Amino acid sequence: MDKKKLVILALALLVILGLAAAQYTPWLYWTLLPKEQADTIIGEASGETALNTIIDINGYNRDRLSEEYAGPFLETQIIIKKLKEYGLAGAEIVSYPGGETWNGIKGELWEITPRRQKLASMRDMVPMLASGSSTSDVTGELAWVGRGTAAEIEAAKVEGKIVVTEGSLGAVHNLACLQKGALGVIGISMSKPYFDPLQMGWAGIGGGRGMRGGPGQPAQAAQPQTPPPAPPKPKFGFQLPVREGDILKQRLMAGEKITVRAQVESKQEKYKMENVVAHIPGTDPNAGEVIFSAHLFEGITKFGANDNTSGSAAILEAARLLNTLIEEGRLPKPKRTIRFLWGPEFSGTSLWVRANKAIMDKTLCNINMDMVGEWLSKNQAFMCLMRTTYGNPHYINDVMENYYRYVGEGNRERIQNRSGFNKVPVRVVAPFGADEPFYYSIETHYGASDHEVFNDWGVQVPGVMMIAWPDRWYHTSGDLPDKSDATQLKRAAAIGAAGAYTVANADDNLAIKIAGETASNGTRRIGQQFVVALETLNGTKAETLADSYKSARTYVEGAVLNEKDTLDSILELATDKAAVGNYILQMKKTIDAVGNANLAALQAHMEATARRLGQKPVVIALTELEKKAAKIFPKQTAKVTAEGYQGYRKYIDGIPAAERAKYPYAAEVSSPTELQLLINGKHSVLDIMKLMDAQSQRKSKVQGILNYLQILKMAGLVEM
């Protein structure tokens, strides 16, 4: 086929794919599971039950009482009690050593003169007392310091006074109290003040916090010297909501002399890391597992109905509904085990994962729920699915997208159906929840929650996150059950349960169905990357045309590599590896064909761009370093996963700094974490660069990647 015909074919294929993505069939709504099974799961899901769990755990901003620290915490008690009530197998509390944490006992702030009135009380609202506040009983004059800059604090002569600020409570405390002699600090919460003037962020103060190296990055080497002095003891901090704080601010700015008395009682409490686990056993213990996760604790003294009591309640409801349907025979027993894990965010989840390496070794994927219960329209939010990165390619992305789409596209009225009785084809609404569309979005990867424990290089269990965003009451006193919605909770529990059950009970036929859907979605994703590539060329200049074209091709080439890796992941579901593998091979050929069509069309666009810029068409040629990189296929060693979550870090940290310095990489590697995950023995170094560049604004360089790989080789983590 000559070049002209290939370009015409490519453009025709792109048009067809574009129409497929844009024109949804208003008469067809499909699920990977048989529709009757999917609808049974949806019907059994109870958003009201999940909402009641949120209210039981976090009905208000409560003060954690001292007796709870002896264990178990109230949250733990409620989850384990319900699991046993629901009949889940293996329901137990698994505790690990914790440490000490601050606990506020009393916090009262009263104006003494010229008026007698209460300004703040921990009894009224727990976040009014800043965490970290020391036991105090002081009387002092108030001093207004504005945003709390060094100049404002200096001008206010704050020694012996209690400062009032609308800046950062912690930063102003450190400067005004610990350095300039102020008695304490009162902060006017500026957390979304124009949306909700009564909410306050969960704020804290302290005498300074130590710094540690990030993942894969060593902390500063210890030097033989006298230990540094202990940080100064913190004083105290109070918070006022904007509505009340503005009154105090205006009085102070008008020159009024105000004296207050602050009474604080606090103590340090020892605590344990409490995790709760349970499972629904599969019929084949060797077939693998699916694991749900949700952090039950957002710190020890901070609470939130949406963040993340809602995620904990939603996976509990997923556990209840699946166990009920399976025990009653309304769903077949799954082939694979479905496991559920609740714990402290990162800190507790990671301890359980490290302690259960045998389970992790056979776990296929993770579904993490974080902030899934909020009323979407009230928050102007979308229910997002955060996919894995290219470093953890997995079909769980497409399985979950299938149910997001089924609920999202089917649960809204379409003009094409206006004359029929079922104007909303797939109505998923809780009896006492919001009757509104399911606003959803399929997103690229985002971390910052417990799925990152599973995605870690030392664990390598691909994890996705379900999360609603934005959240107008995030990390504030306003994160209460009145912002939650039974309909949203029903949808979250049903989608998660359907996704997990699809994987848990997949046979060869369902594996083939998943592969077909993944390939279909993959053509659309490659098409999206093609648009990014076009825009890269559209925005280029004559002097950057060659580099832009190279980058543009990388967007498509990297996407093609990822889609084929994703298809390969499906083979773990198969019993007849040959038959399913052959089907997957055909789907990979489809992906290659789509990729080649895109690249042919991209070349045509490059040539048109070159004419527009008065340049000759670009001819791509590999540099000598790139040719070398194309022949190197790094492979990870057993040490990477031997000790589970973050266990590999000690080998990197153990390389002398002088040796590491010989291989600089920080300026030339967009994400060392992602680079690690892309090492699989099949990707060349050049492939790794393409996979990184295709999903990042910041571009990597071959030499930087080679340098980082050399460090990993010295650590015994990589062979090449």
Where do the language-model regions lie?
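Soluble metallo-hydrolase cores and metallopeptidase-like ectodomains found primarily
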Residues: 124-152, 213-305, 317-320, 324-333, ...
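Extracellular/luminal Protease-associated
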Residues: 22, 55, 67-72, 77, ...
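Long, charge-rich, low-complexity alpha-helical segments
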Residues: 667-720
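Charged, amphipathic alpha-helical linkers/stalks
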Residues: 486-567
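Short helix-loop-beta-strand segments that form the rim/entrance of peptidase-like active sites
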Residues: 52, 207, 321-351, 359, ...
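Metal-dependent peptidase/peptidase-like ectodomains
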Residues: 45, 212-218, 223-228, 237-238, ...
